[in-house]
């Protein structure tokens, strides 16, 4: 599990590497499009989730890859099979979808995030890239997503978590690459770096540390 941590906007986009190599299953690889990466089992769950709020859970789960039934040239969407799979997969991560036909817009933010992740895993993702998966979530919803990320990793899935929230990344990560204003400050194993050190290396980290010291001093000062 790798965690990319940095301040807001420092890791907003990705490009072809200026140097180095991308190795997938022991082979040097060059991706010409996102589809190339997807074909090799590398899936990305973007910050906007790519879900349609007015469409059902099932429709979002299978979007563009619907199971079909019927004779050749007259195939139709197998809604019964799709509903069953969608409900089962969501149930496996602890989310009870009583009606798979319900609109995704009725789900909580954490449930929608888990739906997007579960969809990627179901369709064969071996490497999962998550872009700010907890940025718009409350404490409880974020914990649901983080627990699912840990569960996915424990089942052999490689997870790359992109976030500016060290407090979410540190408990679930094994190694961390720190980015500051678009530049890498290095990759560290968890045993070699503390949460506080990670935070201080990020853009704005030193300012936050200074603020904490100032606030402590203010609290110690006698009231006027």
Regions found by a protein language model. Name each.
Residues 1-6:
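Single conserved hydrophobic/aromatic residue that forms the stacking wall/gate
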């Amino acid at each position: 599990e790798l965690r990319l941590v940095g301040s807001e906007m420092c890791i907003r986009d990705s490009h072809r590497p200026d140097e180095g190599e991308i190795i997938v299953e022991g082979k040097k690889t060059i991706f010409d499009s996102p589809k190339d990466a997807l074909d090799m089992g590398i899936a990305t769950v973007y910050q906007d989730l790519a879900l349609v709020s007015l469409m059902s859970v099932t429709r979002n789960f299978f979007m563009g890859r619907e199971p079909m039934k019927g004779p050749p040239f007259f195939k139709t969407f197998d809604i019964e099979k799709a509903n069953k799979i969608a409900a089962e997969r969501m149930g496996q991560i602890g989310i009870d979808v009583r009606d798979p036909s319900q609109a995704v817009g009725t789900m909580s933010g954490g449930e929608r995030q888990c739906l997007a992740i579960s969809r990627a895993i179901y369709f064969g993702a071996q490497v999962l890239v998550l872009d700010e998966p907890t940025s718009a979530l409350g404490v409880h919803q974020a914990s649901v997503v983080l627990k699912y990320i840990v569960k996915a990793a424990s089942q052999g899935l490689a997870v790359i978590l992109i976030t500016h929230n060290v407090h979410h990344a540190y408990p679930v990560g094994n190694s961390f690459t720190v980015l500051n204003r678009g530049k890498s400050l290095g990759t560290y194993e968890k045993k070699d770096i503390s949460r506080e050190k990670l935070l201080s290396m990020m853009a704005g980290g030193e300012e936050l540390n200074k603020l904490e010291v100032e606030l402590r001093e203010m609290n110690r000062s006698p009231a006027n």
